[in-house]
Amino acid sequence: EQVAVRMIHAAGMVGLEDHIRFSPGFVPAARAALDSGAPILCDARMVSEGITRPRLPAGNAVVCTLQDAGVPELAAKMGNTRSAAALERWRPHLAGAVVAIGNAPTALFHLLNMLEDPACPRPAAIIGCPVGFVGAMESKDALWADQPGSRAQTPSHFRRARPDSPGQLAPPPIRYFRWLRSP
């Protein structure tokens, strides 16, 4: 409940409460990770700047690798966005971390692709709230469908606005999507 209240306060939207989903065990897993000093990995500086550091229980590191040297070159090599490429820099910190995706759908897609590899370290909790009209719904659906364990998100059917006009944004190239496995 406290998490939802903080989300409502941050967004300034009282009606947000009906549009938040938590997996069973999300809050205890995230709390335990934070209490143990786990880092918080953020996809964008805007997300990291929104974290009130004095409230962190163990002086947790807040990590955003988007501006790191070499990320633009890695993105070009990967054929993906800087947001997705920056997540590759998370690997040494990912085990037991709290992940906060609050900007780029491509970052959430890339995280899910990384987690398909059994050798990839697993975070303790994933918060998936990417924004925008291109890929945000699909990335949240993929998080909810494919990641057992602890996660929270604003669901894919919730948007503050809709691009219903002709000339709305086209879907992203297929390389940004993580297609769900066949049943």
Segments (PLM) and residue ranges:
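Buried hydrophobic positions in well-ordered alpha/beta secondary-structure cores of metabolic enzymes
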Residues: 43, 127-128, 167
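Short, basic, glycine/proline-bearing loop/turn elements
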Residues: 10-18, 72-73, 125
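N-terminal glycine-rich anion-binding loops that anchor highly charged ligand groups
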Residues: 1-9
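Conserved mixed alpha/beta catalytic, RNA-binding, or beta-rich assembly cores of soluble enzyme
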Residues: 44-114, 124, 132, 140
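C-terminal functional extensions of proteins
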Residues: 134-183
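A short, well-structured juxtamembrane/interface segment
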Residues: 18-33
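Flexible, charged surface loops at secondary-structure boundaries
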Residues: 32-36, 90-95, 119-121
